[in-house]
Amino acid sequence: MWNEFLKVSLHDPIIWLAFFAGTLILFVWRREVKRARLLEQFANARGFKFERAFDLAELRLSKAGFFSWRDRAKNAISGSMDGRRFTLFEQHANRGKYKSFIRTIVAFEIGPSTSVRSGALGGYGLQMEKTSNHLFVWQAKRRVPPEELEPFLHSIVRNVEQTIH
């Protein structure tokens, strides 16, 4: 009976489709777990705080134009670099059919009266948005690999220092 079941099922395209879909899901899940582990190691090695999921209300992302109600924020790293407090996180965005992306965003705490020179970061390929208490900086639809986080953070902190006053 078991042999007959195998003969029939191995010739069924639905079985093969389910097998490949399951394999793909497992591969993506394992890659995300590995990435989160690398980000956590990066944060711990530098004395930063790491959270796989964090409270979105803390950054008031609902007031930011780049963040949709369907988006999720994951893998947050927070700390201080060159005297500036930051929170780095990954935005998992879904803008409809076949329009999803993940990008790395760095949020800096600023005061409500802080002024930002608009367009100052554009020359570096960076985009930014200011809300009442935060300045958000990112590269368009780019997810920064863990091995590039250190230079990415230093570059953004340096550029933000020149942008705000």
Identify the residue ranges that each predicted region occupies.
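Hydrophobic alpha-helical transmembrane segments
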Residues: L6-A18
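Charged, low-complexity intrinsically disordered regions
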Residues: S9, L38-R46, F50-E58, K63-H165
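Membrane-interfacial helical/loop segments at transmembrane boundaries in membrane proteins
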Residues: M1-E4
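Transmembrane-cytosolic junction motif
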Residues: G22-G47
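Core hydrophobic alpha-helical membrane-spanning segments
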Residues: L17-I25, E109
